[in-house]
Amino acid sequence: MRRLRNRSLWMTLPAAGVLFMGLAARTTAATPAPAAPARTRTALFNMYCYWTGEATLGRVPGVVKTRIGELSGEVVEVEYDPAQTDVGKMAAALKRQGGFYAFLADNPIAKAEGKRYLADSEIKEIERRPRFIESKYNLRTSHPDLAALDLSEQQAIALNSWSYFGGPMPDVLTAEQKEKLGKIKERLAAKGGNR
């Protein structure tokens, strides 16, 4: 099956059979979710668009959880493995997207890490927590069929980033999830749906 480079063309095709055929054609097993790191840290970033920030940070190796919310603007909270990434690498990814405003520190460790990695960026101390809202917007709105699959946090992060940036769908679904997705697609196709 030839890969489609034009995302708008992909979205116009009746996905009921196309996506299922692509999943069924794969013979490799899904990549197992990595074991949760023994120790994680949390970082909070203020930005212009939390949906973009969440999708961007979801592509950074070592990010294990993302949440979006509001605290005098839009924020993304990231739980990450400090053995794989740091605040500087995550901020660099956000700066490449053009959406990073400030690093928010709510404890002495976060403040020290911000000063260590982000000398040229604004670091704001906060006294209250953000009001968090439902995450993974791109996955939920562009691919509700995938969002309905009891995804692990790691699967949801990977698929949400893919939903935003496009490209080949990451092979993160288990065989059971692929089977369930196929049944969802068949039901939708029978009803005349294109999702």
Language model features by range: what are they?
Residues 11-22:
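Bacterial N-terminal signal peptides
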Residues 8-10, 57:
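N-terminal leader/presequence-like segments
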Residues 22-195:
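Flexible coil/turn and secondary-structure edge motifs
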Residues 1-5:
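N-terminal secretory signal peptides that target proteins for export/translocation
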